[in-house]
Every structure is written in C-alpha cells, then in structure tokens.
Design a protein with these regions (language model features):
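Serine/threonine-rich low-complexity intrinsically disordered regions
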Residues: 180, 191, 203-205, 216, ...
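General marker for long, soluble alpha-helical cores
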Residues: 150, 166-168, 177-182
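General zinc-binding finger modules coordinated by cysteine/histidine
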Residues: 186-234
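Segments that form or flank anion-binding pockets
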Residues: 156-159
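WD40 beta-propeller repeat blades
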Residues: 228, 236-239, 246-253
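Cys/His-rich zinc-coordinating modules
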Residues: 3-6, 20-25, 31, 39, ...
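Eukaryotic extended interaction platforms
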Residues: 171-172
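PEST-like, low-complexity acidic/proline-rich intrinsically disordered segments
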Residues: 1-15
Length: 379
C-alpha cells in the first residue's frame, strides 16, 4: 500500500530563517504603504512586459542539467530486527502511564506471544523552485528620482540572490527603467477623497439624541438641538487625505517583479498492510538510508524494495512535469528512511491483544487496550 502526501498545491509561502531582509512571506502583502497602481489600460506598454501576470516562463537555458546516472542505494540489506521484549514492555508501560484513564496493570502483567518487525519505508522528494510574476505597483510621488529611461531587463535577467535551499521565501524588487509618474486615479489628482462617514457633508447624526435634537423635553446639548454633529473622521471638512497617494495627488508607478521560492514536497509511505495508521508517522523519525541531492535527481533504481523504486520514478516524473514549464528548478533532494515498526502480540487475562511500537522514539499505538477506567472526577 502506498500513502502519498504532497504540498505542491499550497499557495502560501512561509519565510525560512535565511529569507533575505526586506522579504515578505504573504503573497498578498504589498511592499509599499498601500498604494495601488492605476488600471492597466492607463499604463504604458513596456517592451518585454506586454502581458503582466503570473507564471513568467523561464528561458529554456535556465533549466537544470540532466542527471548523468541513476541514484543508487547503498549495497546492504535494510532489515531492522524487532525490539526486545524488555524495551517493548517499557514503552507500553510508559504509554499506559501517560493516559489518565488507563490502568497500567495489563502493561505490567502481559505475556508476549510474538514480536514482528515490519519494514516501513518513507520516500520523500523535495523540489526547490523559483517562480517569477510581474505586475504594476506604485507609491506616492514625493519628487523622488524617476527611473524611466533605458531598456528594461527581462524578468529572468534581473539577478536576485537565492536564499537558503529548501526554505520557502518571497521577495519583491522593482524592475529597472519602468518607472513613470501618473496622476492618482483614486482621488483624481486632488490628494483628498470624500469622507465616507459623512458622505462629504462634514456632519453626522448626533449619537446622543439619535438625530432628534432633543432628549425627552430638553434640547440636546451636544448638537445644540440640530440633530447633527461635526464628523470625527474628517474633522468637519468633508474629505480625508487620499490613502493611495498620501495627499500628493501623484503616483510613481513601476513594474514589480515578485520572486517566490518554494519547497515542493512529495512524501510516500510504503506500508505492507500492517494495519498501522501511517498518518501517525508524520512527526516520527526513522533511519536515513539514502540522501541524494542534485539540480535534478534521477529516480532511485537499485533499492531492494521495488515499490520504493517505482514511487521514486513516479515522484520525479510528476515534479518534472508539474514545475519544469512554469518554474525554474533550482535543486532537488530525495531521501529514503526506514521507520522501525514492531507489531507486538500479547496475552492478558486469557485474551490476545496487539499493539505497535514505532519510530526511533519508541512511540506506542493500540486501539484495544484491555483496561480503560474513568477515574477522573470534577472537584
């Protein structure tokens, strides 16, 4: 049985510890103070950037080199013997003691009948990719230098340092020679926009009297009987500073290049029908049997278990088809782990039961513990 897990389709990117300063993790975050560019039909056409948007396809010469030889597993057997009865019982007692409503008596008094070692392999392929997108962006124009002369370099010609491998990260840079000054489309170049709270009137309904002008038989003091008070949002002016241009009336527009580094992970657990829930292995460590890293890895071909070889070939082909046309594959890494799982058969109170000891941490899983008592009470 094969259990596969993939995170390739997730959209969120999380910054790694070595993500460069000035980067931001949320793809929706804007690097400036909230200014947005005017509609695309108001912007000039920049050669090489006629169609902005996601997935700027990298040039063909940016692709990784083809692997020269298949990835080979070490020439040895990968059988882990079952753990000893003493260690299995110690793990079981510790497990029972951690459950407030489990009696530790079965774990201490049980009689072992069989311990079976179950070889379970976890195959993981990581493909570290770089993708680039382009879009118009802007910031309030305060008289800064306008870089609008010269030929703009192509999206993949702009050098951007690569962060630590296999760590998600995102960074935005300004494309050189694409800047231009435009009037603010949000406020029609005025620097101010109508106050939404008072609808440009400068006054709002009195909250004290509800606009009646009176409270009972008395004239309302806060509004002096008018039922209206000065708008607190705009100070009675009726307009507020434009949030797009920050009151400048002009925007410095430019093409923004957004670079996303993403670690796309394919994980498969090759289970031999042991009856063990493999989802429990997500945070469990095993013995590393193979680590292979290259710009593009070749499927494993010599592993003793043919299911692992088949899974490796499927994963490599899938990632190549999924990312080679829209991203730049920077590095790949594949690993094979042997996760120790021992199925323990035991007898207690003349009944047979089963539990599993798994991982190098010797965790325990069982679904039919003999004695469960409800000894907890609410004081």
């Amino acid at each position: 049985q094969l259990f596969c897990f993939r995170n390739s389709d997730q959209d969120e990117a999380h910054p790694g510890p070595s993500c460069p300063a000035g980067s931001y993790a949320d793809p929706n975050t804007v690097a400036n103070d909230g200014a947005t560019a005017p509609p695309a039909d108001m912007m000039p056409v920049v050669p090489g950037y006629e169609s902005l948007g996601p997935y700027v396809i990298p040039p063909s010469d940016f692709g990784p080199t083809q692997p020269q030889a298949p990835s080979r597993a070490p020439e040895r057997r990968f059988d882990i013997p079952a753990i000893t009865e003493e260690l299995a019982q110690e793990a079981f007692i510790k497990y029972a003691s951690s459950k407030c409503c489990y009696s530790s008596k079965p774990a201490k008094e049980m009689v072992f009948t069989d311990l079976q070692s179950l070889n379970t392999y976890r195959y993981r392929l990581e493909t570290f990719t770089e993708s680039r997108t382009t879009e118009w962006d802007s910031e309030p124009y305060n008289g800064q230098v306008v870089d609008g002369f010269g030929v703009a370099p192509g999206p993949w010609s702009i050098p951007v340092p690569i962060p630590s491998l296999f760590q998600d990260c995102q960074k935005a840079v300004r494309v050189p020679h694409t800047s231009t000054v435009k009037g603010c489309h949000s406020c029609l170049n005025l620097g101010r926009s109508a106050c939404r709270r008072c609808v440009n009137s400068g006054r709002t309904q009195c909250a004290y009297c509800g606009g009646m002008g009176r409270t009972g038989s008395n004239r309302c003091s806060p509004c002096h009987g008018s039922g209206m008070t000065r708008c607190h949002s705009c100070g009675g002016v009726g307009s507020i500073t434009c949030t797009t241009c920050k009151g400048q009336g002009k925007l410095l527009c430019f093409i923004k290049l957004k670079i996303t580094w993403k670690n796309n992970v394919y994980v498969a657990v090759i289970d031999k029908g042991s009856g063990f829930p493999v989802e429990l292995l997500d945070r469990i460590s095993g013995e590393k049997l193979l680590t292979d890293m290259a710009p593009m890895v070749y499927p494993v071909v010599s592993f003793p278990d043919s299911s692992v070889n088949a899974e490796s070939e499927s994963a490599v082909r899938e990632h190549q088809a999924q990312f080679a046309t829209t991203c730049r594959i920077l590095q790949q890494r594949q690993t094979i782990e042997l996760i120790p799982i021992t199925r323990v058969h035991y007898v207690w109170n003349e009944k047979t039961h089963i539990y599993f000891v798994y991982g190098t941490e010797h965790k325990v899983y069982t679904k039919d513990y003999p004695v469960k008592c409800c000894c907890c009470s609410i004081l």
